[in-house]
């Protein structure tokens, strides 16, 4: 296995333009494909997850032109639901942002589809979405294990009426149903069971649906109504915001080490909840400055904080390694859904933090980190999880090197992450 050893970084400073947001890129690609007209997406993320979505759209007969650097994509929409005369198998890697929304969208038209992916994808639950789709008349079957991909979908359309979705495990199930709902037979009402996790990701979905011409009535995140008679219309130009989760590593680096880092491509009016990471960092003692399309982080003396991160679970991972440099205890609470991400992130984070010497308590839905005076040089296993690799790169901001196993796993969302980090390291 390939590994990368990062030597201690003395100082960080500079500016980094963020790659496009994964969450925004894949939502916008799908809605552009379902639209009438042509959408020109700029600052599209070039990564594995986006590639899986683009490959699937190609198989589904969608025309698009991709620029040489793969960050500009012109999509000609099919003007409604996908249909296919031949049976198709779509391989979606480990891309939840492709698997879940496509599972819902493919129920709308005609055709027979198998949705599959990497071994880890077959361990990531999808049962709450499938239950809701079946409630709306969809024909979906599990090909291996109940409640998990791979799925076989026979397009039959989605009925109007009321469905219930359990929101307690992943907001992607609701996102998937919301994006398919305007193309159902009539008005759709979605009722939420349990506590809806990651609400800011639903805000992203609703915002992008509106940009493509569809209005959703949001009754306090308990019920969503998609009125009948709507369809997706290409907005023409669509700018993909920089990825807020990717910003977290650089903002944390400046807060930990001093110097000043400016991230561009995202700002105070971002539609991504993960930008609230900067608020958490500020609570820890960092100095944060906001602009319309940038955020600046400067050094503060960091202290541990105890916080609920249910609203920003992805960015919260960066807090776990930032905690190694804070005075006192840091508690990250209400993040059960870390367990159903690219890996079981609670178990993985606890294991790897202990390797570098931290005292860690891992609970069912929380992690508590106590730093140590001197970190230990360790080889960090990344579990084929891009965020594990990027989070643990921050260990190099100590006086101790860190070795990252399988650094290439960052290709899921940020292929040139380590190059960007090197550019900012003095």
Swiss-Prot record:
Pathway terms, separated by semicolons: Metabolic intermediate biosynthesis; chorismate biosynthesis; chorismate from D-erythrose 4-phosphate and phosphoenolpyruvate: step 6/7
Pfam family, one: EPSP_synthase
PROSITE patterns: EPSP_SYNTHASE_1, EPSP_SYNTHASE_2
Sequence positions that bind phosphoenolpyruvate: 22, 96, 124, 172, 345, 387, 412
Residues forming coiled coils: none
EC number, as in UniProt: 2.5.1.19
Entry's Gene Ontology molecular function annotations: 3-phosphoshikimate 1-carboxyvinyltransferase activity
Cellular component terms (Gene Ontology): cytoplasm
Domain of life, source organism: Bacteria
Compartments in which it is found: Cytoplasm
Main EC class the enzyme belongs to: transferase
UniProt binding sites for 3-phosphoshikimate: 22-23, 27, 170-172, 198, 314, 337, 341
Catalytic activity: 3-phosphoshikimate + phosphoenolpyruvate = 5-O-(1-carboxyvinyl)-3-phosphoshikimate + phosphate
Single GO biological process annotation from the record: aromatic amino acid family biosynthetic process
Active site residues per record: 314 (proton acceptor)
Keywords: Amino-acid biosynthesis, Aromatic amino acid biosynthesis, Cytoplasm, Transferase
Summary of subunit composition and partner proteins: Monomer.
Family annotation (HAMAP family): EPSP_synth
Family designation: Belongs to the EPSP synthase family.
Its job: Catalyzes the transfer of the enolpyruvyl moiety of phosphoenolpyruvate (PEP) to the 5-hydroxyl of shikimate-3-phosphate (S3P) to produce enolpyruvyl shikimate-3-phosphate and inorganic phosphate.
UniProt-listed NCBIfam families: aroA
Designated name of the protein: 3-phosphoshikimate 1-carboxyvinyltransferase
Organism of provenance: Vibrio atlanticus (strain LGP32)
Taxonomy of the source species: Bacteria, Pseudomonadati, Pseudomonadota, Gammaproteobacteria, Vibrionales
